[in-house]
Amino acid sequence: MAHQAHAYHMVDPSPWPLTGAIAALLMTSGLAIWFHFHSTTLMTLGLILLLLTMYQWWRDIIREGTFQGHHTPPVQKGLRYGMILFITSEVFFFLGFFWAFYHSSLAPTPELGGCWPPTGITPLDPFEVPLLNTAVLLASGVTVTWAHHSIMEGERKQAIQSLALTILLGFYFTALQAMEYYEAPFTIADGVYGSTFFVATGFHGLHVIIGSTFLAVCLLRQIQYHFTSEHHFGFEAAAWYWHFVDVVWLFLYVSIYWWGS
């Protein structure tokens, strides 16, 4: 890139938005093919392309921001607005699932027996695994805030410990959720209850996995001395995302697990 005498965001042309879009297409088409034809080939191909895209896009942004100094204050401001808009779009994404749930549960059709949960569905006990999951996510919200304060105060070792703890809690949540799915007395095919339950909690689980990956990248960067007390927006974005995932879970827990049971 030629020398620039201004502070604005001028990045090199990047192939990653295109490869990311192709990966998303392959994964969504692959999901439909998996459901209907029991073949996971296309979905696996999409997942591999997505992982390659993520790795190389993250690598390029780290090069631009950390080593080339392109992330000037106006650029950081733009990135902040971008992250805020992204999280706002995610809020509306989950709003659709809550709408579907409340539409189905507040006025259950006669076909469901006129009651909620529908006749024949045994809901999960909200005070067993779901309550433990709530505690785990709330604890991870505390540890990620601890990591943020440690980075701002230049406490390198504490930041690494608290970030590692947050990631472990994220994986623990995912493992508990997988166990709950495995042992659930109903499936995604069990009418509107199964659909709304598994789609809403499943997408939330996917967001936990994405958030854990985001934080894991931040942990590796913190170990490599990439973050300073003034310059650590990559971590801040991950922390915002994690808090968003936390809040969505609280709404899911209160709505679907507790009230909906």
Swiss-Prot record:
It catalyses: 4 Fe(II)-[cytochrome c] + O2 + 8 H(+)(in) = 4 Fe(III)-[cytochrome c] + 2 H2O + 4 H(+)(out). Component of the cytochrome c oxidase (complex IV, CIV), a multisubunit enzyme composed of 14 subunits. The complex is composed of a catalytic core of 3 subunits MT-CO1, MT-CO2 and MT-CO3, encoded in the mitochondrial DNA, and 11 supernumerary subunits COX4I, COX5A, COX5B, COX6A, COX6B, COX6C, COX7A, COX7B, COX7C, COX8 and NDUFA4, which are encoded in the nuclear genome. This is Cytochrome c oxidase subunit 3. One of its GO terms (biological process) is mitochondrial electron transport, cytochrome c to oxygen. Its EC number is 7.1.1.9. GO terms for molecular function: cytochrome-c oxidase activity. It is found in: Mitochondrion inner membrane. One of its GO terms (cellular component) is respiratory chain complex IV. Belongs to the cytochrome c oxidase subunit 3 family. Component of the cytochrome c oxidase, the last enzyme in the mitochondrial electron transport chain which drives oxidative phosphorylation. The respiratory chain contains 3 multisubunit complexes succinate dehydrogenase (complex II, CII), ubiquinol-cytochrome c oxidoreductase (cytochrome b-c1 complex, complex III, CIII) and cytochrome c oxidase (complex IV, CIV), that cooperate to transfer electrons derived from NADH and succinate to molecular oxygen, creating an electrochemical gradient over the inner membrane that drives transmembrane transport and the ATP synthase. InterPro entries: Cyt_c/ubiquinol_Oxase_su3, Cyt_c_oxase_su3_dom, Cyt_c_oxidase-like_su3, Cyt_c_oxidase_su3-like_sf, Cyt_c_oxidase_su3_a-hlx. Keywords: Membrane, Mitochondrion, Mitochondrion inner membrane, Translocase, Transmembrane, Transmembrane helix. Residues 1-15, 67-72, 153-155, 224-232 are mitochondrial matrix. It comes from Carassius auratus. Pfam families: COX3 (PF00510). Residues 35-40, 106-128, 184-190, 257-261 are mitochondrial intermembrane. Signal peptide: none annotated. It is a multi-pass membrane protein.
